Regions:
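WD40-repeat beta-propeller superdomains and closely related acidic/aromatic-rich repeat-like regions
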Residues: 20-346
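Bacterial N-terminal signal peptides
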Residues: 9-19
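Bacterial N-terminal signal peptides that target proteins for export
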Residues: 1-11
């Protein structure tokens, strides 16, 4: 069942993003869409860069895209892999990549018409990252990195054993496309020069169960700072230039069904200037913004869900899409929510 949600005004901060480092930015959020009554176990959500489409994937392998802000269903499709674990749009919004960590294939879909553009034999794909300007993407599969020509739907290069026997769990390009950053299942981050894929830097995050499953990874505009959140939800900030961990922001589960954060892929996003980071709120009840200079966290909004199980943040379109369970145990029926961010001005 689809319905338009009554706007929910969120908690706001006090000063401009460019203002005093001791003060939070004036970000407010309003819920602009809610789609409830979803029966399959939804597992992944993604926003197109321009904010015109939201895609949802579930554990049964079904893809559903909706137009924004209306929420009108555009198309449904079913992936060959049998499940959807991650979704990512191409920079121009024309393609949608679907990963399946226990599947035998990786897929590209044409967003406009809902047709498969390519089905590639890439097993256990954990992550995919589109190049910002080239028709190319990188797929992490077990320990390898596969370079894929998005136009032809072909693998053009494979870098085996990219992390020295560790599996690749996350990947992201810098905004200028000159660097690729990857994270392994053991919490090791590597920075690769593009397109040569020569190693530029390597950093290890603090060793614990937390780092053994990084689920979201982003790199700042200057390419000198990266952020990752892991299985327990903590956010790790890494100084790539100094090749060391900079700071950690905590997160904890709250509801009984909220023990792990394995579905929080693509739940981090740097601000345009790279000085702030959007991230899941404490207990995954909404969104907060982190001041990377002083280590403080400020609320952006808190929803009424017991917790959110997946999230996608699009800074260019000022939108956040979230998936929520029906109860504190993480069971259905599930729902999709979309919130719009607003920045105040002086």
């Amino acid at each position: 069942m689809r319905h338009s949600a009554a706007p929910i005004r969120a908690a706001a901060a006090a000063l401009l993003l460019a203002g005093c480092a001791e003060s939070p930015p004036p970000v407010t959020a309003e819920r602009v869409l809610a789609v409830g009554g979803i029966q399959p176990v939804v597992n992944a959500v993604a926003l197109s860069p321009d904010g015109s489409v939201v895609a949802v994937g579930d554990m049964d392998g079904e893809l559903v895209t909706r137009e924004l802000p209306s929420g009108t269903e555009r198309w449904r499709g079913r992936v060959a892999a049998g499940r959807v674990d991650g979704l990512v749009f191409s920079p121009d919004g024309s393609l949608l990549a679907s990963t399946a960590q226990d599947g035998r294939t990786f897929e590209l879909w044409q967003v406009l018409v809902g047709r498969q553009a390519a089905v590639l034999e890439i097993r256990d794909s954990r992550t995919a990252a589109f190049h910002p300007t080239e028709p190319t993407l990188v797929v992490g599969s077990l320990g390898a990195l596969h370079v894929v020509d998005a136009q032809r739907g072909e693998i053009t290069r494979t870098l085996p054993n990219a992390h020295g026997g560790e599996n690749v769990y996350a990947a992201a390009f810098s905004s200028d496309g000159q660097a690729l950053v990857t994270a392994s299942d053991q919490g090791n981050i590597k920075v690769w020069a593009w397109p040569t894929l020569t190693l530029r830097a390597s950093v290890s995050m603090s060793k614990s169960l937390e780092q053994m499953a990084p689920v979201s990874l982003v790199i700042g505009r200057q390419g000198t700072r990266a952020a990752a959140n892991g299985l327990l939800g903590r956010v790790h900030i890494v100084d790539l230039a100094k090749q060391q961990e900079e700071r950690i922001f905590d997160n904890t589960p709250e509801a009984p069904g909220h023990g792990m954060h394995a579905e929080m892929r693509r739940s981090l996003a740097f601000s345009q200037d790279g000085d702030w980071l959007f991230a899941p709120a404490m207990h995954d009840r909404g969104v907060r913004i982190l001041n990377l200079a002083n280590g403080k966290a400020y609320p952006v909004f808190t929803g009424d869900a017991p917790f959110y199980k997946a999230m996608s943040i699009s800074v260019p379109s000022s939108l956040v899409a979230l998936l929520r369970p029906g109860d504190e145990q993480g069971r259905g029926p599930y729902a999709l929510e979309v919130w719009r961010l607003t920045y105040s001005t002086r």
